[in-house]
Each structure stands twice: as structure tokens, then as C-alpha cells.
Curated annotation (Swiss-Prot):
One of its GO terms (cellular component) is extracellular region. Glycans are attached at N81, N99, N148, N229. Disulfide bonds join C7-C141, C28-C44, C78-C234, C120-C188, C152-C167, C178-C203. N-glycosylated by units composed of Fuc, Man, GlcNAc, Gal and NeuAC residues. It comes from Gloydius brevicauda. This is Thrombin-like enzyme kangshuanmei.
Amino acid sequence: VIGGDECNINEHRFLVALYHSRSRTFLCGGTLINQEWVLTAAHCDRFFMYIRLGMHNKNVNFDDEQRRSPKEKYFFRCSNNFTKWDKDIMLIRLDSPVNNSAHIAPLSLPSNPPSVGSVCRVMGWGQTTSPQEDLSDVPRCANINLFNFTVCRAAYPWLPATSRVLCAGDMEGGIDTCNRDSGGPLICNGQFQGIVSKGQNLCAQPRKPALYTKVFDHLDWIQSIIAGNKTVTCPP
């Protein structure tokens, strides 16, 4: 996160870190949505990966930190009216459930769609500078604004006219999610509304908000898979 501050140690109990299990490199963020499931971005997927839960500083292990491997992964395969930008979402089932603890607790799915103009919270261990690849050892948090989708269409003319993505950032620049913040949450008015997906190659540029997969528009799919329906019908 660019332009943020170190997150309060108690404000990100649902934030998880995805790692490559062979190189041990940090890949992405993710969000614990119940004891057994993590929601992240599809572009974070790697064949070999593990998940750290209850982590703050990458180099310090809390007593209650837990590690899990993916048992199952689900991707949004719908084709009707969905573009590739609408599909940057992945559900990971953990190989065993995690227990709530001082540094681990899930974040519930949204009960309402987000409203344009909301102030939203982003967090992650990603780049703190751009284009230099300075990663953070601790998660950084920042507040950004939720814009009408047309703002992102003006910034990225290749975007389709309608999309199940959210557009959020700081129009003046200087505050943004960046590389390796991918997969982490966008929290608007206390609700988990977006997944960090894509932005400009140079992060935190003026008038270039980032794109976030809209969690609310994928709720039926998420809830069906968690309920055990593996052949989920696509939304209309």
C-alpha cells in the first residue's frame, strides 16, 4: 500500500498472506471469510502455495500464527456477460479449519452493495513505492474513496462498459494499493466489498484509481460453493 501507515495490530485479524511454498516468497493477500475458507484474487494462484494466518510482521511469528495449505481452489468460470476483469476471484478451502484467536478472526461477507462516495479501507504487505519494488514487512493500511465505474473507464478505456468491478482510489494520487497487495480486501463502511485486482503499472498516479473485484456481485457463487454445491450455476 502506497501512502498508508502501519495497520493497527488488531484491525486485520482476517487478513491472510499467500506464499509460494517452494521459494518461500510472499505473493498476495487474502481474506478469511470463515474458519475454512479464504477469498482472494484468481491472478494470485500458484501451483505450490501456503497461507499464513495471524501474521503482522513477516519476520516475527505470533504464538497464535497458523499455516495452512489449499485443499481445494475454485475459480469463477461463468461466461455469460462476464469479462475477464469480472473473474479475478478465487475461493480457497483450507486443508483444516482455523480457530479464532488474538490475531485471527474471519470477516463476514457484505449484506449490502457499496455506495459510491464511501470511504474504504485497504491493507496489505505490498509495494510502498512505485515503480521501485519496496515491499513492507508489516501490513500498511490506507483510506481511499469509492468512485463511479465511469471514472475507471475514463482512466482505462479498454474496460467494458459495465463490469462487476469496483473503482477506488485517490484522485489526487499518492494513496493506492500496489503490486502484491493483490487479493486483499477493500472494506467500505465496515463491509468487505472488494478484492484488490488490478491498477496502473505505476501505482498511486492522479486520476488512475485501481480496480477491485466486486464481492457483492459474486455472493451467490461464493455461498453455493461453501455450502457444497460444486456445480454452481452462473448468475444472470
